[in-house]
Structure formats: structure tokens, C-alpha cells
């Protein structure tokens, strides 16, 4: 399943590796719903563009430290609140969520709605999803350190051992570069 996530991620999109990974996952007993959940999870890599740009854009627009409007405050409470996950997230990506909300309430809502999809059905265990996300953030073509640290911590909290982490990183290192999808 980790190999499927890596090969299907936007940083690789390797057609042969995707096919092989699907075949291997199916032979190992993975269901179509589980495979789809993994692909849904890794499709979220695109939000890293938001993470890398929201604060600089908000600073340039001079809205980074503006007070939330009442609507924005309501959205903040609904989606972020006091959830420990988002507190840890803010440690890795300081001010991102607030900057994104100040720039676009619609994007803020869409971020939370889209990123939550693979966490709703529970087809794949959370620990495995964290290992997959961590591996995707560690591929040679991506190297997204804030996400790597966050997902590593989460995987460890969920009981992932050293061997599982090392295997995920090994698979990440072997991920082929994106050569286009024809």
C-alpha cells in the first residue's frame, strides 16, 4: 500500500509502478476501497502549494496579522478549534491556516473538506496512512520536511515501529521521478 501511494502521488505518477502496485496490493488482499483511500490520501500532496505560499501572499497583501472577521472566526472554530492535530500542524507550518483563512474562506473550507476525505471511511488504518504520507513527503522529488516531521510523529504516536518507518523511507527513496503521464 505504501508503494501504491508513492507511485500514484503527483511527484511520481509512474504508470507502470501504479499498475504493479495495484496488482501487488490486490494480491495481498487489499480491497478496491482501501486502494482508493490510499490514492485519495496522496492526492492531497497538491495542498503543499497552499502551505508554501499562503503566508508569503498574506504578508504581501498585508493581511497576515489582521483580525478574523466574525465569519472567519466561526470557520476557525469549526475546522481548527482546539484540536491537538492542528496545534501540531501549526508547529510545523506556523500561521499557514490563519493566512489561508484570511486570503480565502472558500479555500480554507475546501482544504479541510478535501483533506478529510481519506480519514472518514476508515478503510485503511491511520498508522498506515501516516506512514504513506510520511513516505510521500520524503521522496527524492518532493522532500516536504514539515509534513514529513508531522506524519512521522503521528505514525510513532499510533504505534509504528522503527522497522516500519525505515521500510517506508526505503520505499520513498526508491520512488521513480515523475516522467509524465502519456
Describe each region flagged by the PLM.
Residues 1-14, 128-144:
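Amphipathic, charged-and-aliphatic alpha-helical interface segments
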Residues 9-28, 49-128, 153-157, 162, ...:
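Acidic, glycine/proline-rich low-complexity segments that act as flexible tails and inter-domain linkers
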Residues 147, 164-182:
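Preference for long, well-ordered alpha-helical segments
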Residues 40:
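Phosphate/adenylate-binding glycine loop and adjacent helical scaffold
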Residues 31:
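Arg/Lys-rich, alpha-helical DNA-contact motif
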Amino acid at each position: 500500500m505504501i508503494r501504491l501511494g508513492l507511485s500514484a502521488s503527483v511527484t511520481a505518477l509512474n504508470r507502470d509502478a501504479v499498475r504493479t502496485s495495484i496488482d501487488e496490493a490486490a494480491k495481498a488482499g487489499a480491497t478496491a476501497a482501501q486502494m482508493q483511500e490510499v490514492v485519495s490520501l496522496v492526492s492531497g500532496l497538491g495542498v503543499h502549494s497552499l502551505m508554501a505560499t499562503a503566508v508569503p501572499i498574506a504578508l504581501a497583501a498585508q493581511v497576515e496579522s489582521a483580525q478574523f472577521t466574525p465569519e472567519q472566526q466561526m470557520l476557525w472554530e469549526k475546522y481548527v478549534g482546539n484540536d491537538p492535530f492542528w496545534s501540531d500542524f501549526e508547529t510545523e507550518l506556523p500561521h499557514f491556516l490563519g493566512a489561508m483563512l484570511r486570503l480565502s474562506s472558500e479555500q480554507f473550507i475546501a482544504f479541510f473538506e478535501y483533506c478529510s476525505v481519506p480519514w472518514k471511511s476508515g478503510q485503511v488504518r491511520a498508522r498506515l496512512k501516516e506512514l504513506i504520507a510520511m513516505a510521500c513527503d520524503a521522496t527524492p522529488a518532493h522532500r516536504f520536511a514539515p509534513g514529513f516531521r508531522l506524519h512521522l510523529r503521528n505514525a510513532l504516536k499510533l504505534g509504528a515501529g522503527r522497522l516500519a518507518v525505515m521500510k517506508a523511507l526505503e520505499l520513498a527513496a526508491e520512488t521513480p521521478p515523475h516522467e509524465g503521464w502519456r
